From Swiss-Prot:
This is ATP synthase subunit beta. ATP binds at G157, G158, A159, G160, V161, G162, K163, T164. The lineage of its organism: Bacteria, Pseudomonadati, Bacteroidota, Flavobacteriia, Flavobacteriales. It is an enzyme of class 7 (translocase). Belongs to the ATPase alpha/beta chains family. It comes from Flavobacterium johnsoniae (strain ATCC 17061 / DSM 2064 / JCM 8514 / BCRC 14874 / CCUG 350202 / NBRC 14942 / NCIMB 11054 / UW101) (Cytophaga johnsonae).
C-alpha cells in the first residue's frame, strides 16, 4: 500500500492538525501513527485522535512540537505505534514509540518484529481463573491483603508516603525470587527515579550488562561500549519510560507501550512459550492525568472534577488487557497517586473497580514512623478467604484487624480522658494493638541506605506466629519500641530482652 502524505495545517501545543489533499485520498484510521521529520532530522510521531472535516485529521504528538511549523510534510505509516518484541528486548529501555533510550541502538519494530500498542483484550474463553497466592516477604501485605498471582494490585497513597519505595521493594523481592520476567512502565514520574531503578537492577543482577561494564560502573563510569550485548538476553526485565517532562500524548500512551511488551512475554510467539510476567506501573494516576490534558486539548467537555468524559472507558480498555490467559499470566502492581489524600477522587475511585488487592498507604501511619505506611484497616484483598489461605492465616489476619479496629475506636477516649479512664481489659487491648501496629513495620532492602538497617524478607509462617504471640499476650513484658522495624518475631524478642537488660 502506498504511503499517505499530508501537510501540517495547524499546531496548538501538542495538538497537530494534518490535512490530506487530493481526490479519493484515504485518510489514516483512528490511532494510526503519522511521522514528521523536523529540520534537525529528528522524527516526530503523531497519533490520529479524530477526523475533523473532509480531509483533515486531528492528532496528538508523542514528543515536543518545538520547531514544527505549518506546511511540514507528514507521512502516514498505516499502523498504530509499534513496540519492538523478541529476545533482544530483554534488559532494554524504550520510550513511548519503541525507540531505545539507553544509548544502545534501536531495534526493528515493523512486521513480525513489532506489536501495536492498541490491541483487544483477550477473549473470554482464553482467560485463566485459578487463585494462587503470590508471597512478597512483606509482613503487612502477606498477612492482611495477600496478592493473587495473575491479579491486579493497587498501591494507593498521597504524595510522599512511600509508593515508589514500596514498588521498588516489590520489584526487588518478587523479581529476584520469582525469577520470571518483569516489565516496568514509568508513567509521568521523576526521571531520577528511573535512573535509580536502572542502577539498582544492574547491581542486583536482574539486568545484565556484563562484567566489564559493571567494573566501569563501580569506578563511577558509564561506558556503553563495554556492554555485553549477547549477554543482555539473560536479563529479566524491560523498561518503558514516559516521564514527567514528556508531553501529555506520551504520558497517556506509555502504559500501553509497556503493556504490549508484557502481553508479548505472556502469550509468547513462535518458539517462545507463554510466561508468567510481572508488570509494574508507576504511576497509573499520571495515565489518567495525561488523558485529561489530552481530552481538554481536543476540546472535549470535561466531566466531574475536570476529568475527561471517557475516564472509565480508557481505564477499562487498558485494565482489561492486564489479565492472565491459558498461555501465561500478568501480575500487575500499579502505584496510584491519590490527589489531596482523597480516595473518592474520580481517578483513584475508577481504578479501585479493576483491582484484586488494594494496599492503601496512610499519611497518619507514616507520621508515626511506621514504614511501610500501609493502613491495615483500609487495605483489602479478594483472596483473603479461608479456602485459599487456610484457617490459620485467615484467623490471624482477622484477629489483627479486630484489635487494631478496637484501638482505633478507643483513640478518641484516650485523647480526651487519657489511658487511666479505660478498663483493665481495654488497657491490655491498647498495649497489644500498639505492639501489633509497630510489628507491622519492616526494614526494606531498597531503603537500607537511609535507615542503616539491613532489609529482610519474612516467611508467612513466621509472620502468623509473631502476631499470634503478641495478641495472645505472650510478649506483654517487652517494651513497644522493640517491635519497631523488625523482621521476624525472634528479632523483636532479642531486641526487647536487650532493652530490658540495659534498663
Amino acid at each position: 500500500m502506498s504511503k499517505v502524505i499530508g501537510k501540517v495545517a495547524q499546531i496548538i501545543g501538542p495538538v497537530v492538525d494534518v490535512v490530506f489533499n487530493g481526490k479519493d485520498v484515504e485518510l489514516p484510521k483512528i490511532y494510526d501513527s503519522l511521522e514528521v521529520t523536523k529540520k534537525d532530522g529528528t522524527l516526530l510521531v503523531l497519533e490520529v485522535q479524530s477526523h475533523i472535516g473532509e480531509n483533515t485529521v486531528r492528532t496528538i504528538s508523542m514528543d515536543s512540537t518545538d520547531g514544527l511549523s505549518r506546511g511540514y510534510e507528514v507521512v502516514g505509516t498505516g499502523n498504530p505505534i509499534q513496540m519492538p518484541i523478541g529476545p533482544d528486548v530483554y534488559g532494554r529501555l524504550f520510550n513511548v514509540v519503541g525507540d531505545a533510550i539507553d544509548g544502545l541502538g534501536n531495534l526493528p519494530k515493523t512486521g513480525e518484529n513489532g506489536l501495536p500498542i492498541h490491541r483487544q483484550a483477550p477473549k473470554f474463553e482464553d482467560l485463566s481463573t485459578s487463585s494462587e497466592v503470590l508471597f512478597t516477604g512483606i509482613k503487612v501485605i502477606d498477612l492482611i491483603e495477600p496478592y493473587a498471582k495473575g491479579g491486579k494490585i493497587g498501591l494507593f497513597g498521597g504524595a510522599g508516603v512511600g509508593k515508589t519505595v514500596l514498588i521498588q521493594e516489590l520489584i526487588n523481592n518478587i523479581a529476584k525470587g520469582h525469577g520470571g520476567l518483569s516489565v516496568f512502565a514509568g508513567v509521568g514520574e521523576r526521571t531520577r527515579e528511573g535512573n535509580d531503578l536502572l542502577r539498582e537492577m544492574l547491581e542486583s543482577g536482574i539486568i545484565k550488562y556484563g562484567d566489564d561494564f559493571m567494573h566501569s560502573m563501580e569506578n563511577g563510569g558509564w561506558d556503553l561500549s563495554k556492554v555485553d550485548m549477547p549477554g543482555m538476553r539473560e536479563s529479566k526485565a524491560t523498561f518503558v519510560f514516559g516521564q514527567m517532562n514528556e508531553p501529555p500524548g506520551a504520558r497517556a500512551r506509555v502504559a500501553l507501550s509497556g503493556l504490549s511488551i508484557a502481553e508479548y512475554f505472556r502469550d509468547g510467539a513462535g518458539s517462545d512459550q507463554g510466561k508468567d510476567v510481572l508488570f509494574f506501573v508507576d504511576n497509573i494516576f499520571r495515565f489518567t492525568q495525561a488523558g485529561s490534558e489530552v481530552s481538554a486539548l481536543l476540546g472535549r467537555m470535561p466531566s466531574a472534577v475536570g476529568y475527561q468524559p471517557t475516564l472509565a472507558t480508557e481505564m477499562g480498555a487498558m485494565q482489561e488487557r492486564i489479565t492472565s490467559t491459558n498461555k501465561g499470566s500478568i501480575t500487575s502492581v500499579q502505584a496510584v497517586y491519590v490527589p489531596a489524600d482523597d480516595l473518592t477522587d474520580p481517578a483513584p475511585a475508577t481504578t479501585f473497580a479493576h483491582l484484586d488487592a488494594t494496599t492503601v498507604l496512610s499519611r497518619k501511619i507514616a507520621e508515626l514512623g511506621i514504614y511501610p505506611a500501609v493502613d491495615p484497616l483500609d487495605s483489602t484483598s479478594r483472596i483473603l478467604t479461608p479456602h485459599i489461605l487456610g484457617d490459620e492465616h485467615y484467623n490471624c489476619a482477622q484477629r489483627v484487624k479486630e484489635i487494631l479496629q478496637k484501638y482505633k475506636q478507643l483513640q478518641d477516649i484516650i485523647a480526651i480522658l487519657g489511658m487511666e479512664e479505660l478498663s483493665e481489659e481495654d488497657k491490655l487491648s491498647v498495649s497489644r494493638a500498639r505492639r501489633v501496629q509497630r510489628f507491622l513495620s519492616q526494614p526494606f532492602h531498597v531503603a537500607e541506605q537511609f535507615t542503616g538497617i539491613p532489609g529482610v524478607l519474612v516467611d508467612i509462617k513466621d509472620t502468623i506466629k509473631g502476631f499470634n504471640m503478641i495478641i495472645d499476650g505472650e510478649l506483654d513484658h517487652l517494651p513497644e519500641a522493640a517491635f519497631n522495624l523488625k523482621g521476624s518475631i525472634q528479632d523483636a524478642i532479642e531486641a526487647g530482652e536487650k532493652m530490658l537488660a540495659e534498663a
